[in-house]
């Protein structure tokens, strides 16, 4: 098995590209802790997003036997292809169909018929779009372990009532049970980012609430569009415009509403409109 160079030395030979948000993990203690948290087992179908200089890739593939990686950087993808046990997909991760990829990997012996495990040190400049992209593929994914900006992780796992609780919290908690695993300081990277990082574990709910994603996204976006105002001035206007007659207290701020209440509202509002109770468009 061809083994990449030790992380710190490898980072010194590659010029990080700012436009790709490249910060390479070099702290071996952190690498070991992440691998221990992931606990890869031989034969498991795993996909790593943004492998970079293979600091995490190498210990993972040693335990798995084979690993699929998604890398946008052409030079890094070329380097990774020298590794006999890596399947390299050079692509923008936002264009990757993870459901189709899971089906492909299931059909590749000796991989057993199971869901994907997805890991990665996500580029901080597009981490939220990646998380939302993966929402659509939750049924094909077993779990996710990501390195992210610490502030983003805190928003992901936030509970109602605090300033960190927002649109990201609601949308992700709808589909995942999440846990912040460890803090990663800037000095663990080359070059060091200007922010602290953290590792999060994301376990898709076996039976997420059956709601219309577009409806939920619209309601949550409206609710948090003006955080300081009561929902009566934002989401309440939408409900009034659609003549919604259900029970939902708009005398609160968006951050005070639990995830389950947003889910219930999305389900009821979608049914209300589908039943033809929505008023006709102007001029109809």
Curated annotation (Swiss-Prot):
Binding of S-adenosyl-L-methionine, residues: 23, 25, 50, 71, 92, 121
InterPro entries xrefs: KsgA/Erm (IPR001737), rRNA_Ade_diMease-like_C (IPR023165), rRNA_Ade_Mease_Trfase_CS (IPR020596), rRNA_Ade_methylase_Trfase_N (IPR020598), rRNA_adenine_dimethylase (IPR011530), SAM-dependent_MTases_sf (IPR029063)
Signal peptide as annotated in the record: none
Keyword Methyltransferase attributed: yes
A GO MF label: RNA binding
Swiss-Prot/TrEMBL keywords: Cytoplasm, Methyltransferase, RNA-binding, rRNA processing, S-adenosyl-L-methionine, Transferase
Family assignment from sequence similarity: Belongs to the class I-like SAM-binding methyltransferase superfamily. rRNA adenine N(6)-methyltransferase family. RsmA subfamily.
Protein name: Ribosomal RNA small subunit methyltransferase A
Source organism of this protein record: Verminephrobacter eiseniae (strain EF01-2)
Gene giving rise to this polypeptide: rsmA
